[in-house]
Amino acid sequence: MNFANVILSKSKPVRNPDRSDESIWTSDECAKYYLCLDGEVFEFHCSQDLLFDVNRQLCDKRQNVHNCELTTETLVSKPLLDMATCANDTHLGCADGTCLPAEYFCDGSLDCDDMSDEGWCDVHYDPNAAERCDPKLCQLPDCFCSKNGTETPGNLVPSQTPQMITLTIDGPVNHENWDAYANQLFTGDRRNPNGCPIKATFFVSHQYTNYRHVQKLWNDGHEIAINSITLRGPEEWWSKNATVEDWFDEMVGQANIINRFGRVRMEDFRGMRVPYLSVGWNRQFLMMQEFGFVYDATVVAPYVDPPYWPYTLDYKMPHRCSGNNQYCPTRSYAGLWEMVINPLKHNNHVCATLEYCPSNFTRDDVYSVLLNNFKRHYLKNRAPFGIHLNAAWLKNNDYLLAIKRFVNELLKLPDVYFVTYREVIDWIRRPTPVLQLRKFEPWQCKSRRFEESEIACPKPNTCKLPSKVLQHDKYMITCSSCPKTYPWLRNEFGFE
Protein backbone atom coordinates (compact mmCIF):
# COMPACT_ATOMS: atom_id res chain seq x y z
CA MET A 1 0.00 0.00 0.00
CA ASN A 2 1.53 3.34 -0.99
CA PHE A 3 1.74 6.55 1.07
CA ALA A 4 -1.48 8.14 -0.23
CA ASN A 5 -3.51 4.96 0.24
CA VAL A 6 -2.40 4.67 3.87
CA ILE A 7 -3.57 8.22 4.57
CA LEU A 8 -6.84 7.80 2.69
CA SER A 9 -7.66 4.67 4.66
CA LYS A 10 -7.50 6.55 7.97
CA SER A 11 -9.97 9.05 9.41
CA LYS A 12 -7.48 10.49 11.94
CA PRO A 13 -4.10 12.22 11.51
CA VAL A 14 -1.16 9.87 10.79
CA ARG A 15 2.55 10.15 10.03
CA ASN A 16 4.23 9.50 6.68
CA PRO A 17 4.66 5.69 6.51
CA ASP A 18 7.45 6.11 3.94
CA ARG A 19 9.68 8.30 6.12
CA SER A 20 13.26 7.06 6.47
CA ASP A 21 14.52 5.40 9.64
CA GLU A 22 17.09 8.18 10.02
CA SER A 23 14.40 10.90 10.10
CA ILE A 24 11.88 9.25 12.44
CA TRP A 25 13.08 11.01 15.58
CA THR A 26 14.03 14.33 14.00
CA SER A 27 12.08 17.37 15.13
CA ASP A 28 10.99 18.21 11.62
CA GLU A 29 9.62 14.76 10.79
CA CYS A 30 8.00 14.14 14.17
CA ALA A 31 6.21 17.49 13.95
CA LYS A 32 4.52 16.54 10.66
CA TYR A 33 1.18 14.80 10.31
CA TYR A 34 -1.20 14.09 7.46
CA LEU A 35 -4.98 14.05 7.20
CA CYS A 36 -7.44 13.08 4.49
CA LEU A 37 -10.08 15.75 3.82
CA ASP A 38 -12.68 15.15 1.10
CA GLY A 39 -10.52 12.52 -0.58
CA GLU A 40 -7.37 14.65 -0.67
CA VAL A 41 -4.26 14.31 1.54
CA PHE A 42 -3.10 17.44 3.39
CA GLU A 43 0.16 17.94 5.26
CA PHE A 44 0.18 19.77 8.62
CA HIS A 45 3.02 20.83 10.89
CA CYS A 46 3.04 21.52 14.64
CA SER A 47 4.09 24.96 15.86
CA GLN A 48 7.73 25.66 16.64
CA ASP A 49 9.24 23.48 19.40
CA LEU A 50 6.21 21.13 19.42
CA LEU A 51 5.97 17.53 18.18
CA PHE A 52 2.94 15.52 17.11
CA ASP A 53 1.74 12.79 19.48
CA VAL A 54 -0.06 10.29 17.25
CA ASN A 55 -1.73 8.45 20.15
CA ARG A 56 -3.07 11.57 21.83
CA GLN A 57 -3.75 13.25 18.46
CA LEU A 58 -2.25 16.59 19.46
CA CYS A 59 0.91 18.71 19.36
CA ASP A 60 2.87 18.89 22.60
CA LYS A 61 6.30 19.73 24.00
CA ARG A 62 9.20 17.47 22.98
CA GLN A 63 9.60 15.97 26.46
CA ASN A 64 5.96 14.78 26.43
CA VAL A 65 6.03 12.98 23.05
CA HIS A 66 7.43 9.44 23.03
CA ASN A 67 5.95 7.82 19.91
CA CYS A 68 7.66 9.41 16.91
CA GLU A 69 8.26 5.88 15.58
CA LEU A 70 4.52 5.14 15.33
CA THR A 71 2.74 5.84 12.06
CA THR A 72 -0.85 5.56 13.27
CA GLU A 73 -2.73 5.74 16.54
CA THR A 74 -2.38 2.63 18.71
CA LEU A 75 -5.83 1.19 19.30
CA VAL A 76 -6.54 -0.04 22.82
CA SER A 77 -8.35 -3.37 23.16
CA LYS A 78 -11.74 -3.45 24.86
CA PRO A 79 -11.59 -4.94 28.38
CA LEU A 80 -13.49 -8.15 29.11
CA LEU A 81 -14.86 -6.75 32.40
CA ASP A 82 -17.45 -9.18 33.83
CA MET A 83 -17.06 -11.47 30.79
CA ALA A 84 -13.75 -12.61 32.24
CA THR A 85 -13.74 -15.62 34.56
CA CYS A 86 -12.47 -13.82 37.64
CA ALA A 87 -12.42 -15.84 40.86
CA ASN A 88 -13.17 -12.74 42.92
CA ASP A 89 -16.62 -11.18 42.40
CA THR A 90 -15.20 -7.70 43.04
CA HIS A 91 -12.71 -8.04 40.16
CA LEU A 92 -13.06 -7.33 36.43
CA GLY A 93 -11.06 -8.55 33.45
CA CYS A 94 -8.55 -6.72 31.26
CA ALA A 95 -8.59 -7.47 27.53
CA ASP A 96 -5.99 -10.21 28.06
CA GLY A 97 -8.03 -11.83 30.84
CA THR A 98 -6.02 -10.49 33.78
CA CYS A 99 -8.32 -9.82 36.74
CA LEU A 100 -8.01 -6.63 38.77
CA PRO A 101 -10.20 -4.87 41.38
CA ALA A 102 -13.17 -3.17 39.70
CA GLU A 103 -12.23 0.24 41.06
CA TYR A 104 -8.99 0.16 39.02
CA PHE A 105 -10.95 0.53 35.79
CA CYS A 106 -11.31 4.09 34.49
CA ASP A 107 -9.59 5.62 37.51
CA GLY A 108 -7.01 7.52 35.46
CA SER A 109 -4.08 5.17 36.15
CA LEU A 110 -2.88 2.39 33.84
CA ASP A 111 -3.10 -0.97 35.62
CA CYS A 112 -3.72 -3.55 32.86
CA ASP A 113 -0.58 -4.46 30.90
CA ASP A 114 -2.57 -3.97 27.69
CA MET A 115 -3.88 -0.55 28.92
CA SER A 116 -7.46 -1.71 28.39
CA ASP A 117 -8.55 -0.53 31.86
CA GLU A 118 -8.25 3.10 30.69
CA GLY A 119 -9.10 2.75 27.00
CA TRP A 120 -12.90 2.46 27.14
CA CYS A 121 -14.02 4.96 29.72
CA ASP A 122 -16.78 7.19 28.42
CA VAL A 123 -20.16 7.24 30.12
CA HIS A 124 -21.32 4.23 28.08
CA TYR A 125 -18.42 1.90 28.98
CA ASP A 126 -17.13 2.92 32.42
CA PRO A 127 -18.04 -0.05 34.69
CA ASN A 128 -18.02 2.34 37.66
CA ALA A 129 -20.20 5.00 36.02
CA ALA A 130 -22.63 7.01 38.13
CA GLU A 131 -26.28 5.94 38.21
CA ARG A 132 -29.12 8.01 36.80
CA CYS A 133 -30.71 10.60 39.10
CA ASP A 134 -32.97 9.25 41.84
CA PRO A 135 -34.79 12.28 43.34
CA LYS A 136 -36.07 10.16 46.23
CA LEU A 137 -32.53 9.41 47.37
CA CYS A 138 -30.97 12.72 46.34
CA GLN A 139 -32.21 15.22 48.91
CA LEU A 140 -31.20 18.79 49.76
CA PRO A 141 -29.11 20.30 51.25
CA ASP A 142 -26.31 17.90 50.26
CA CYS A 143 -27.59 16.44 46.98
CA PHE A 144 -29.56 17.93 44.10
CA CYS A 145 -30.59 16.42 40.77
CA SER A 146 -33.67 16.09 38.59
CA LYS A 147 -34.59 13.75 35.76
CA ASN A 148 -34.05 16.29 32.99
CA GLY A 149 -31.89 18.77 34.92
CA THR A 150 -34.28 21.71 34.50
CA GLU A 151 -36.49 21.41 37.59
CA THR A 152 -36.37 24.17 40.22
CA PRO A 153 -35.01 23.32 43.71
CA GLY A 154 -37.67 23.07 46.40
CA ASN A 155 -40.37 22.75 43.71
CA LEU A 156 -40.83 26.51 43.78
CA VAL A 157 -42.80 28.07 40.94
CA PRO A 158 -40.88 30.62 38.84
CA SER A 159 -42.67 33.61 40.34
CA GLN A 160 -41.42 32.59 43.80
CA THR A 161 -37.86 31.93 42.60
CA PRO A 162 -35.23 34.69 42.50
CA GLN A 163 -33.52 35.12 39.17
CA MET A 164 -29.88 34.74 40.13
CA ILE A 165 -27.25 36.18 37.81
CA THR A 166 -23.63 35.15 38.13
CA LEU A 167 -20.91 37.44 36.84
CA THR A 168 -17.79 35.29 36.48
CA ILE A 169 -14.43 36.58 35.29
CA ASP A 170 -11.46 34.39 34.31
CA GLY A 171 -7.79 35.28 34.15
CA PRO A 172 -5.25 37.54 35.85
CA VAL A 173 -6.27 40.57 37.91
CA ASN A 174 -4.01 43.55 37.22
CA HIS A 175 -3.74 47.20 36.16
CA GLU A 176 -5.13 46.41 32.71
CA ASN A 177 -8.55 45.44 34.08
CA TRP A 178 -8.59 47.02 37.53
CA ASP A 179 -10.38 50.17 36.37
CA ALA A 180 -13.15 48.04 34.82
CA TYR A 181 -13.63 46.21 38.11
CA ALA A 182 -13.12 48.93 40.72
CA ASN A 183 -14.41 52.01 38.90
CA GLN A 184 -16.84 50.68 36.30
CA LEU A 185 -18.66 47.51 37.37
CA PHE A 186 -18.34 47.19 41.14
CA THR A 187 -18.54 50.74 42.44
CA GLY A 188 -20.78 49.92 45.40
CA ASP A 189 -23.80 51.83 44.10
CA ARG A 190 -25.21 48.92 42.09
CA ARG A 191 -27.29 47.02 44.62
CA ASN A 192 -29.53 43.98 44.72
CA PRO A 193 -33.16 44.26 45.91
CA ASN A 194 -32.06 43.39 49.47
CA GLY A 195 -29.80 46.45 49.53
CA CYS A 196 -26.49 44.58 49.22
CA PRO A 197 -23.90 45.48 46.54
CA ILE A 198 -23.71 43.16 43.54
CA LYS A 199 -20.89 40.62 43.64
CA ALA A 200 -18.89 38.52 41.17
CA THR A 201 -16.79 35.35 41.15
CA PHE A 202 -13.19 35.79 39.99
CA PHE A 203 -11.34 32.71 38.69
CA VAL A 204 -7.77 33.89 39.17
CA SER A 205 -4.72 32.64 37.27
CA HIS A 206 -1.15 33.35 38.38
CA GLN A 207 0.98 35.07 35.75
CA TYR A 208 0.54 38.87 35.58
CA THR A 209 -1.77 38.90 38.62
CA ASN A 210 -1.54 41.77 41.12
CA TYR A 211 -2.22 40.03 44.41
CA ARG A 212 -2.95 43.29 46.20
CA HIS A 213 -5.91 43.77 43.86
CA VAL A 214 -7.07 40.18 44.49
CA GLN A 215 -6.91 40.89 48.21
CA LYS A 216 -9.04 44.04 47.76
CA LEU A 217 -11.67 42.14 45.74
CA TRP A 218 -11.86 39.58 48.54
CA ASN A 219 -12.12 42.33 51.17
CA ASP A 220 -15.03 43.80 49.20
CA GLY A 221 -16.99 40.53 49.33
CA HIS A 222 -16.32 39.06 45.90
CA GLU A 223 -15.62 35.35 45.62
CA ILE A 224 -12.08 34.32 44.72
CA ALA A 225 -11.80 30.99 42.89
CA ILE A 226 -9.07 29.11 41.03
CA ASN A 227 -8.07 29.14 37.34
CA SER A 228 -4.63 27.39 37.54
CA ILE A 229 -1.03 28.57 37.83
CA THR A 230 0.20 28.20 34.27
CA LEU A 231 -2.81 28.47 31.93
CA ARG A 232 -0.62 26.16 29.84
CA GLY A 233 -1.37 24.81 26.41
CA PRO A 234 -2.22 22.96 24.34
CA GLU A 235 -5.87 23.05 25.36
CA GLU A 236 -6.17 19.27 25.05
CA TRP A 237 -3.50 18.75 27.72
CA TRP A 238 -6.03 19.56 30.44
CA SER A 239 -8.67 17.14 29.19
CA LYS A 240 -6.51 14.28 27.96
CA ASN A 241 -3.11 14.31 29.63
CA ALA A 242 -3.12 16.03 33.02
CA THR A 243 -2.65 13.50 35.84
CA VAL A 244 -4.22 13.76 39.28
CA GLU A 245 -0.86 15.11 40.46
CA ASP A 246 -0.88 17.73 37.69
CA TRP A 247 -4.35 18.86 38.73
CA PHE A 248 -3.21 19.14 42.33
CA ASP A 249 -0.09 21.10 41.39
CA GLU A 250 -2.03 23.54 39.18
CA MET A 251 -5.15 24.15 41.26
CA VAL A 252 -4.15 23.59 44.87
CA GLY A 253 -0.85 25.25 44.02
CA GLN A 254 -2.69 28.37 42.85
CA ALA A 255 -4.81 28.35 46.01
CA ASN A 256 -1.58 28.32 48.02
CA ILE A 257 -0.16 31.23 46.01
CA ILE A 258 -3.29 33.37 46.45
CA ASN A 259 -3.41 32.51 50.15
CA ARG A 260 0.25 33.43 50.67
CA PHE A 261 0.44 36.58 48.55
CA GLY A 262 -3.21 37.71 48.45
CA ARG A 263 -4.01 36.65 52.04
CA VAL A 264 -7.32 35.04 50.98
CA ARG A 265 -8.22 32.40 53.55
CA MET A 266 -7.91 28.79 52.40
CA GLU A 267 -11.43 27.96 53.57
CA ASP A 268 -12.78 30.61 51.19
CA PHE A 269 -11.59 28.75 48.10
CA ARG A 270 -14.72 26.86 47.07
CA GLY A 271 -14.44 26.38 43.33
CA MET A 272 -12.36 26.23 40.18
CA ARG A 273 -12.66 26.58 36.43
CA VAL A 274 -10.34 24.82 34.00
CA PRO A 275 -8.51 26.93 31.38
CA TYR A 276 -10.14 26.89 27.94
CA LEU A 277 -13.15 25.12 29.51
CA SER A 278 -11.31 21.82 28.94
CA VAL A 279 -12.95 19.50 31.45
CA GLY A 280 -10.44 17.00 32.85
CA TRP A 281 -12.51 13.82 33.16
CA ASN A 282 -12.43 11.78 36.40
CA ARG A 283 -8.86 12.80 37.24
CA GLN A 284 -9.89 16.43 37.74
CA PHE A 285 -12.84 15.58 39.96
CA LEU A 286 -10.93 13.04 42.01
CA MET A 287 -8.44 15.77 42.89
CA MET A 288 -11.27 18.20 43.69
CA GLN A 289 -12.96 15.75 46.02
CA GLU A 290 -9.71 14.85 47.78
CA PHE A 291 -8.75 18.50 48.33
CA GLY A 292 -12.22 19.61 49.40
CA PHE A 293 -13.36 21.83 46.54
CA VAL A 294 -17.11 22.47 46.64
CA TYR A 295 -17.79 23.11 42.95
CA ASP A 296 -16.50 23.04 39.39
CA ALA A 297 -17.59 25.68 36.87
CA THR A 298 -16.24 24.26 33.61
CA VAL A 299 -18.83 21.94 32.05
CA VAL A 300 -20.71 23.43 29.09
CA ALA A 301 -24.18 21.96 28.56
CA PRO A 302 -25.95 21.71 25.20
CA TYR A 303 -28.31 24.57 24.42
CA VAL A 304 -31.77 23.74 25.78
CA ASP A 305 -34.93 25.66 26.58
CA PRO A 306 -35.56 25.83 29.50
CA PRO A 307 -31.93 25.86 30.68
CA TYR A 308 -30.22 23.60 33.23
CA TRP A 309 -29.93 24.22 36.95
CA PRO A 310 -26.66 23.47 38.78
CA TYR A 311 -26.52 19.93 40.18
CA THR A 312 -24.38 17.73 42.36
CA LEU A 313 -22.35 14.92 40.84
CA ASP A 314 -23.78 12.20 43.07
CA TYR A 315 -25.54 10.94 39.95
CA LYS A 316 -25.02 10.94 36.21
CA MET A 317 -25.08 14.37 34.57
CA PRO A 318 -28.53 15.20 33.14
CA HIS A 319 -27.10 16.13 29.73
CA ARG A 320 -24.48 14.95 27.27
CA CYS A 321 -20.95 16.26 27.43
CA SER A 322 -20.88 19.20 25.02
CA GLY A 323 -18.32 21.66 23.68
CA ASN A 324 -14.72 21.31 22.54
CA ASN A 325 -12.22 19.30 24.58
CA GLN A 326 -14.84 18.33 27.16
CA TYR A 327 -14.15 15.03 28.88
CA CYS A 328 -16.83 15.03 31.54
CA PRO A 329 -16.70 12.89 34.68
CA THR A 330 -18.33 9.48 34.47
CA ARG A 331 -18.16 8.50 38.14
CA SER A 332 -20.13 9.68 41.16
CA TYR A 333 -18.57 12.47 43.24
CA ALA A 334 -20.97 12.85 46.13
CA GLY A 335 -21.66 16.41 47.23
CA LEU A 336 -19.50 18.04 44.54
CA TRP A 337 -21.46 20.70 42.63
CA GLU A 338 -21.31 21.39 38.90
CA MET A 339 -22.12 25.05 38.19
CA VAL A 340 -23.02 24.16 34.63
CA ILE A 341 -22.55 26.73 31.86
CA ASN A 342 -25.70 27.25 29.79
CA PRO A 343 -24.48 28.50 26.39
CA LEU A 344 -25.70 31.66 24.71
CA LYS A 345 -27.60 31.69 21.43
CA HIS A 346 -27.33 34.43 18.81
CA ASN A 347 -29.35 33.79 15.66
CA ASN A 348 -28.06 30.36 14.55
CA HIS A 349 -24.81 30.60 16.50
CA VAL A 350 -24.34 29.00 19.94
CA CYS A 351 -21.36 30.06 22.08
CA ALA A 352 -20.32 28.78 25.50
CA THR A 353 -19.39 32.26 26.72
CA LEU A 354 -19.22 35.76 25.27
CA GLU A 355 -15.54 35.23 24.54
CA TYR A 356 -16.47 32.45 22.09
CA CYS A 357 -19.18 34.47 20.33
CA PRO A 358 -18.37 36.15 16.98
CA SER A 359 -15.48 38.59 17.29
CA ASN A 360 -17.26 41.24 15.22
CA PHE A 361 -19.95 41.79 17.87
CA THR A 362 -20.94 45.42 18.39
CA ARG A 363 -21.98 46.98 21.68
CA ASP A 364 -25.63 46.49 20.72
CA ASP A 365 -24.98 42.87 19.74
CA VAL A 366 -23.58 42.07 23.18
CA TYR A 367 -26.50 43.75 24.90
CA SER A 368 -29.15 42.02 22.77
CA VAL A 369 -27.51 38.59 23.17
CA LEU A 370 -27.49 38.97 26.94
CA LEU A 371 -31.06 40.26 27.09
CA ASN A 372 -32.53 37.60 24.79
CA ASN A 373 -30.81 34.76 26.62
CA PHE A 374 -31.72 36.23 29.99
CA LYS A 375 -35.39 36.03 29.00
CA ARG A 376 -34.99 32.28 28.36
CA HIS A 377 -34.11 31.92 32.05
CA TYR A 378 -36.33 34.60 33.58
CA LEU A 379 -39.52 33.66 31.72
CA LYS A 380 -39.06 29.89 32.11
CA ASN A 381 -37.55 28.01 35.08
CA ARG A 382 -35.27 30.79 36.39
CA ALA A 383 -32.13 28.70 36.35
CA PRO A 384 -29.16 30.95 37.26
CA PHE A 385 -28.09 33.08 34.30
CA GLY A 386 -24.33 33.27 33.80
CA ILE A 387 -22.42 36.18 32.31
CA HIS A 388 -19.02 34.56 31.83
CA LEU A 389 -16.27 37.03 30.98
CA ASN A 390 -12.56 36.91 30.28
CA ALA A 391 -10.21 39.59 31.58
CA ALA A 392 -8.87 40.20 28.06
CA TRP A 393 -12.39 40.40 26.55
CA LEU A 394 -13.26 43.28 28.89
CA LYS A 395 -10.51 45.44 27.38
CA ASN A 396 -12.98 46.27 24.61
CA ASN A 397 -14.69 49.40 25.94
CA ASP A 398 -17.83 48.83 23.85
CA TYR A 399 -18.26 45.41 25.44
CA LEU A 400 -17.77 46.87 28.91
CA LEU A 401 -20.40 49.53 28.23
CA ALA A 402 -22.83 46.83 27.04
CA ILE A 403 -22.29 44.86 30.26
CA LYS A 404 -22.89 47.96 32.38
CA ARG A 405 -26.08 48.78 30.47
CA PHE A 406 -27.36 45.23 30.91
CA VAL A 407 -26.61 45.18 34.64
CA ASN A 408 -28.28 48.56 35.16
CA GLU A 409 -31.43 47.47 33.33
CA LEU A 410 -31.81 44.20 35.21
CA LEU A 411 -31.34 45.78 38.62
CA LYS A 412 -34.64 47.57 38.00
CA LEU A 413 -36.40 44.21 38.44
CA PRO A 414 -37.48 43.35 42.01
CA ASP A 415 -36.52 39.66 41.84
CA VAL A 416 -33.11 39.75 40.12
CA TYR A 417 -29.96 39.24 42.21
CA PHE A 418 -26.31 39.40 41.12
CA VAL A 419 -24.62 36.83 43.34
CA THR A 420 -21.50 34.67 43.60
CA TYR A 421 -21.40 30.94 42.94
CA ARG A 422 -21.09 30.36 46.65
CA GLU A 423 -24.34 32.27 47.18
CA VAL A 424 -26.09 30.30 44.42
CA ILE A 425 -25.23 27.06 46.21
CA ASP A 426 -26.35 28.54 49.54
CA TRP A 427 -29.75 29.31 48.01
CA ILE A 428 -30.16 25.91 46.31
CA ARG A 429 -29.39 24.19 49.60
CA ARG A 430 -32.12 26.27 51.25
CA PRO A 431 -34.63 27.33 48.55
CA THR A 432 -36.18 30.56 49.80
CA PRO A 433 -39.06 32.42 48.10
CA VAL A 434 -38.38 35.90 46.73
CA LEU A 435 -40.49 37.66 49.36
CA GLN A 436 -38.37 36.17 52.15
CA LEU A 437 -34.96 36.99 50.70
CA ARG A 438 -34.43 40.17 52.67
CA LYS A 439 -34.05 37.91 55.70
CA PHE A 440 -32.09 35.15 53.93
CA GLU A 441 -28.95 35.05 56.08
CA PRO A 442 -26.39 33.81 53.48
CA TRP A 443 -27.18 36.80 51.25
CA GLN A 444 -26.88 39.47 53.93
CA CYS A 445 -24.11 42.04 53.57
CA LYS A 446 -22.75 42.07 57.08
CA SER A 447 -19.30 43.56 57.59
CA ARG A 448 -16.68 40.85 57.82
CA ARG A 449 -13.86 41.04 60.32
CA PHE A 450 -10.36 40.83 58.90
CA GLU A 451 -7.01 40.55 60.59
CA GLU A 452 -4.76 43.53 59.92
CA SER A 453 -2.58 41.47 57.56
CA GLU A 454 -5.69 40.44 55.58
CA ILE A 455 -6.64 44.01 54.65
CA ALA A 456 -5.35 45.19 51.27
CA CYS A 457 -2.52 47.69 51.75
CA PRO A 458 -2.34 51.14 50.09
CA LYS A 459 1.31 50.68 49.02
CA PRO A 460 2.13 47.08 48.03
CA ASN A 461 5.55 45.65 47.26
CA THR A 462 6.60 45.36 43.63
CA CYS A 463 8.85 42.30 43.55
CA LYS A 464 11.38 41.61 40.78
CA LEU A 465 11.92 37.86 40.97
CA PRO A 466 14.13 35.38 39.13
CA SER A 467 12.54 32.29 37.59
CA LYS A 468 14.55 29.25 36.53
CA VAL A 469 11.53 27.73 34.81
CA LEU A 470 10.55 30.80 32.79
CA GLN A 471 14.22 31.77 32.32
CA HIS A 472 13.76 35.47 32.93
CA ASP A 473 12.81 37.83 35.74
CA LYS A 474 9.14 38.28 36.58
CA TYR A 475 7.37 41.05 38.47
CA MET A 476 4.77 40.34 41.14
CA ILE A 477 2.81 42.82 43.27
CA THR A 478 1.77 41.82 46.79
CA CYS A 479 1.12 43.28 50.23
CA SER A 480 3.19 40.43 51.65
CA SER A 481 6.99 40.34 51.71
CA CYS A 482 8.72 39.41 48.45
CA PRO A 483 9.73 35.75 48.03
CA LYS A 484 13.21 34.70 46.86
CA THR A 485 12.02 33.46 43.47
CA TYR A 486 8.91 33.72 41.29
CA PRO A 487 6.25 31.31 42.64
CA TRP A 488 5.47 28.45 40.27
CA LEU A 489 4.47 24.80 40.14
CA ARG A 490 5.79 22.90 43.19
CA ASN A 491 7.37 26.13 44.42
CA GLU A 492 4.25 28.08 45.35
CA PHE A 493 5.95 30.14 48.04
CA GLY A 494 9.03 31.07 46.03
CA PHE A 495 11.48 29.46 48.44
CA GLU A 496 13.79 27.91 45.84
Give the ranges of each region predicted by the language model.
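Cysteine-rich, disulfide-bonded extracellular modules and peptides in secreted proteins
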Residues: M1-Y104, G108-D122
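Extracellular/luminal ectodomains of secreted and membrane glycoproteins with large N-terminal domains
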Residues: S27, Q57, A102, C106, ...
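Extracellular secreted precursors and ectodomains with disulfide-bonded cysteine-rich loops/domains
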Residues: D28, Y34, F44, Q57, ...
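Aromatic-lined glycan-binding groove of carbohydrate-active enzymes
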Residues: M288, T312-V369, N373-H377
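Extended, charge-rich low-complexity interaction segments
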Residues: P442-W488
